[in-house]
Amino acid sequence: MNAKEFLIELLKFKSVTPNDDGALNFIAMELSDFEAFFIEKEGIKNLLLTKKFNDEGEHLAFGGHVDVVPAGEGWKNDPFEPLEEEGFIYARGAQDMKSGVAAFIDAVKDVSFKGRRLSLILTSDEEGEAKYGTKAVLEWMKEKNMLPDYAVVAEPTCVKKMGDSIKIGRRGSINGKLLIRGKQGHVAYPEKCINPVHDFAPVLKLLAGFDLDPGSAEFSPSKIVITDIRGGMGVCNVTPNDLKLMFNVRNSPDTSLEDVKSYVEKICHGLNYELELKQSSEAFLTNIDNKIVQKMNESVQKITHEVPELNTKGGTSDARYFAKYGVKVVEFGVCNDRIHAIDERVSIEEFEKLCLVFKDLIENF
């Protein structure tokens, strides 16, 4: 089947995270000339497809996920019965990211590759906890001395036009929970209470929206963003016993968890508080002079006639795991204007260009 037909079939699988619904077996059968390894951990199914081309040279990998977020109600069609209409395919996962997966599967068919090995790393655990997916496959590859040198993750990266954005890194994510302790009491006798809201009020303006670093050419500033704040029992005559606050920092490599801790400790000096911090993902950056960045840039410009912005914007992705294992990685895919949305759709023209970009990258790597 051709690339579009394969994409339509792939979109029919109800692969709501972490269930692949048979999609990985379907992919393995499509690429029967690749050696297939099904790697399972904690009930999560992953697939490594790999093919040796030469005894020497570099190992290039493509990464992606077949799991999708729940579809919800209000669609113009059954979200797992793809609808082709006016140049688009409507289905859950059309942009995020079955189009990317279908594109690199099409690209590796009957391709000429001067390197040593091509691999495809696929998981059904990205949209959920993402603990036993790509990371587990890379750990398995490390144990077998099979780690790739370079990788492309086919996440939907483009914003307004196909070809306008390549991700060369991602910010990390630090989650914070702050508990300010007080002493509950009658609102008419504030002198007998310790009101944590009043105590924390002067500190709030020092925390909310604070930039922990000035940013750089590649990264925006590491900003503290408050996501939740609550205290009291929802009544007007009792002061709160404590105040609970949650925040997130999307951090660049210039700001660490320890930097966040030091700043919060400094501004909360004198308060009775508890602080809990957790790094849910780490920041990474692939240098713009690296081969994978240069070659991807060349292929994107050649096929799309756009000059892509090399950036680190957006949330986290599985690319961070490649970076953690020392693999030089970039991300490129179709536009992301409908990801996780009702009536998610992908432009057929964008998808066809993505197939060509990946094939050109492989043949000229």
UniProtKB/Swiss-Prot annotation:
Catalytic residues (UniProt): D67, E126 (proton acceptor)
InterPro entries: ArgE/DapE_CS, Bact_exopeptidase_dim_dom, DapE_proteobac, Peptidase_M20, Peptidase_M20_dimer, Peptidase_M20A
Gene3D superfamilies: 1.10.150.900, 3.30.70.360, Zn peptidases
E.C. numbers: 3.5.1.18
Top EC category: hydrolase
Entry keyword set: Amino-acid biosynthesis, Cobalt, Diaminopimelate biosynthesis, Hydrolase, Lysine biosynthesis, Metal-binding, Zinc
Cofactor(s) the protein needs: Zn(2+); Co(2+)
Cofactor details (free text): Binds 2 Zn(2+) or Co(2+) ions per subunit.
GO biological process, one term: L-arginine biosynthetic process
Pathway(s) it belongs to: Amino-acid biosynthesis; L-lysine biosynthesis via DAP pathway; LL-2,6-diaminopimelate from (S)-tetrahydrodipicolinate (succinylase route): step 3/3
A Gene Ontology molecular function term of the record: succinyl-diaminopimelate desuccinylase activity
Any matching Pfam family: M20_dimer
Function text: Catalyzes the hydrolysis of N-succinyl-L,L-diaminopimelic acid (SDAP), forming succinate and LL-2,6-diaminopimelate (DAP), an intermediate involved in the bacterial biosynthesis of lysine and meso-diaminopimelic acid, an essential component of bacterial cell walls.
Assembly and oligomerization: Homodimer.
Entry protein name: Succinyl-diaminopimelate desuccinylase
Gene label: dapE
